[in-house]
């Protein structure tokens, strides 16, 4: 019965989405379908503040990620096109390549080169093809935040914007030695995002990949070192969900989390904290970009109007309005104005410093797993719990968990994603 109700609810939402876009198309306005900024308050800000400065009326229609490809496929199959521009996360746009639904934007993308969108972000927009299929729109990421009280304990000669994991461990160890407290923190609670730390930061930094080198010797050494560093981590980290709370309370002096989950601390006490990139390992400074892009569908009713809207949304002034109002940060190169909120400035600078780092190594969120994403995350969290929290032998755990990982990847058929090398067929741990 639950499945039936879920199917009916999904079908109703999809039908309402079709009706909304059809009515909007009849009005002659541009149709902008987005999986992002869906909450009522966010959507209102999009319509009334961000799109308000555009010269033409735009109907901003939102869709849940699971509805998004269904709607696009329905238009492709019917031959009736109503949508001009789509906005979605990188991983939500990737499946549209198989549908051959996205119009190439090579010439248009070339005209935007002067805006300073980082090369790696534009490369993501090719979706592993030869063509520019989306233009980066807005971004978030994961950053580190430290209480300024921790700064005197930094290792000699350490640059906070270019820390290594060895230096991070030494920093936390010195704080513990001098204060008697374990003040490094991670969001390892039940609803925390600790799995993203492993998938996007630690594994790429030490192994250069995620799935392929999952059980490698480099991974074994990585887990051994991380288990050692955990001795300086606040034990309450296994309950933390949003790191802004322990940062504000002083229970943690150094923390890692998604920018949205530390932003409140930066906004409340911008003079008390510093924000900076995650650390680097032997293979580079692994980081996981949260990137939303703008694309045009093949058969869009107004191709020129669609590109004009994308042009507007990627202008520096529009990007700043977006950052002020919805907390997504610019993808273009722009100077933050003097009156920009201090907490947002700290976060934006940390993201910019991450991307511009000479050793930056982007690791995309998992792609192609469908509804099995949580099972993928569980492999990394189970590995963490067994090795770090329970002290089990790293080699034994990695060999066992690699079997689970390979079985999952085979079942989903998901090919490798960056930074793992491209694969023919399902990605596999070697």
In which residue ranges do the predicted regions lie?
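Short, solvent-exposed loop/beta-turn-alpha elements that line the ligand-binding surface or hinge
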Residues: 106-117, 160-161, 203-222, 228, ...
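Extracytoplasmic/periplasmic substrate-recognition and gating elements
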Residues: 228, 234, 267-331, 364-365
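Extracytoplasmic "Venus flytrap"/periplasmic binding protein-like
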Residues: 31, 48-117, 152-154, 253-254
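Hinge/lid segment of periplasmic solute-binding proteins
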Residues: 89-143, 169, 274-276
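Long, aromatic- and glycine/proline-rich binding clefts that accommodate carbohydrate-like moieties
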Residues: 324-386, 414-430
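Extracytoplasmic/periplasmic solute-binding protein
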Residues: 125, 129-138, 142, 166-211, ...
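Short, polar/charged alpha-helical segment
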Residues: 37-59, 380, 398
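Glycine-centered hinge/linker elements that transmit conformational signals in sensory
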Residues: 169-175, 209-240
